[in-house]
Amino acid sequence: MKLKKILLTLGLLFFATQVFAVKAKIRFLFPVSSKSVVDGFDNSTIKTSEFVLAFMMPLSQHTQLGLGYSYLNARIKDPLTSSEGYYGSFRAHLLELGAGYSGFELTRTISLVFESAVRIPVSGEAELQGNETTQNATGISGMGYYFSSGLEYGNLEISLFYQRRNLSFDGLTVTRSAKSTDVALHITEYGIAFGYTF
């Protein structure tokens, strides 16, 4: 876990030192459609929020490489009809590696922009309460993917996005009818992303 944090810090510092070329982009994601499966929770609803900060290094006039940070917050709760009454809160810090292209100009000031990225969890925290017990995660693993296409106007960007995340939290299990299941999040989302580059 410490090694992952060190690698993330060194990577961000490397990009930050290239100040003459690097731009920072902040991105807010607003899902409009989602499909979530949480192992151990069959009839529960998960609520998520996410924030992304990326450093973009130009490879050419219209192509950029990105290194960034994604923060995911998720909560899930058993329905009232459940006798176990499980409630879980999950937080994940992910390293984002991606690329973007904005070479298709619609007008002199508006361009089409395409982005894709892979997200790797570097650390996370989670707590699971229920069945008269409280559990805390001991680690996190998994992978995430992000794709978007949209319009870029100056420093502003609006895009339609698709993303999927598969995250497992070590040390968390749900027990129902004497059967234990390891907790993992499988989240697929479609929505609108708003970005600003500075």
Where are these regions (language model features)?
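Residues on the lipid-exposed face of transmembrane beta-strands in outer-membrane beta-barrel proteins
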Residues: 51-59, 69, 97-101, 116-118, ...
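Predominantly the C-terminal beta-signal and adjacent terminal strand-loop region
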Residues: 78, 144-198
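Repeated loop/turn-to-beta-strand initiation elements of outer-membrane beta-barrel proteins
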Residues: 24-26, 61-67, 106-110, 155-160
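Detector for outer-membrane/organellar transmembrane beta-barrel domains
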Residues: 24, 85, 94-102, 111-123
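Cleavable N-terminal export/targeting peptides
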Residues: 1-23
